[in-house]
Amino acid sequence: MAETLAHRFTEFLLESNALKFGDFTLKSGRKSPYFINAGAFDDGKKIAALGAFYAEKISQAIVHNTIPRNIDTVFGPAYKGIPLAVSTAIALTAGHNMTVGYTFDRKEKKDHGDGGWMVGTPLTDGMKVLLVDDVMTAGTAVREVIPKLKAEANVEVVGLVLSVDRMEKTKDSDLSAVKAVEAEFGFPVLAIANVREIFDAAAKMKNADSAPLLSHDIQQRAAAYLEEYGA
C-alpha cells in the first residue's frame, strides 16, 4: 500500500529535525508533547522538498474541487511565508504544469524604488490568491494579512494551505483556529497533515535502533494533550 501524503510528510519533518517529541512550553503557555520548528528548513534541498509537499496538497485539493485550478498567485506572509510562497510556486510549475506567481508582503511599507507593501506578482482586481503558511495557532497572521491584500486590490482569497493543523481549541472558543478562520472568512483551510495523522504515522515508525520511535509515555501524553486541548 502506498504511503499517504501525511505519512511521507511526517517522515520528512523527522528527517529535517523539524518535528521533535518531548516536553515543550508553547507561546500559549500550554505544555506540548511535540514541537514543530519551521526554522529547520534551512537549505535549498529542504525548502524545495517542502514546496513540493505544499504543491502536492494543492494539486489534491484542485482534483477534489476544494480550491480552483486557476490560481493567479501564491501569497506567503512575511517572514516565514516568503520561502513557502516561492518554493510552492516553483513546485506547482515544475511538477504540476501550473504557471502561478508568488507574492509576499513587507513588514514596513517602502516609499522608494518599486515601493508599496507587496513584493512579487502585483495584485490586481479579480485575481485568485492562495495563501500559504506554516502552523496556525490562533489565526493572527491571517487576520493581519487579509486587510493588506484587500487594500492592495479586490482579490479573491481562494484558500489557505498550512504545513500542520494542530487541531487545538483556541483560548476563547471550542473551535480550532482552522475552523474559526474558515467560519470567519469563508475560504477552505487545508493542511498537509494534521497532528493526529502525524502521531499515527510516527507510532508506526522505528528509530535507528529498530525500537519504536514514540515511547509509550509520549503516546499517552499526546493522547492526554489532545483530549484536553483538541478541537
From Swiss-Prot:
SUPFAM superfamilies: PRTase-like. One of its GO terms (cellular component) is cytoplasm. Keywords: Glycosyltransferase, Magnesium, Pyrimidine biosynthesis, Transferase. Pathway: Pyrimidine metabolism; UMP biosynthesis via de novo pathway; UMP from orotate: step 1/2. Its EC number is 2.4.2.10. Pfam families: Pribosyltran. 5-phospho-alpha-D-ribose 1-diphosphate binds at residues 27, 79-80, 106-107, 110, 112, 133-141. Its cofactor is Mg(2+). InterPro entries: OPRT, Or_phspho_trans_dom, PRibTrfase_dom, PRTase-like. GO terms for biological process: 'de novo' pyrimidine nucleobase biosynthetic process; 'de novo' UMP biosynthetic process; pyrimidine ribonucleoside biosynthetic process. Orotate binds at residues 137, 166. GO terms for molecular function: magnesium ion binding; orotate phosphoribosyltransferase activity. It catalyses: orotidine 5'-phosphate + diphosphate = orotate + 5-phospho-alpha-D-ribose 1-diphosphate. Homodimer. Catalyzes the transfer of a ribosyl phosphate group from 5-phosphoribose 1-diphosphate to orotate, leading to the formation of orotidine monophosphate (OMP). Belongs to the purine/pyrimidine phosphoribosyltransferase family. PyrE subfamily. This is Orotate phosphoribosyltransferase.
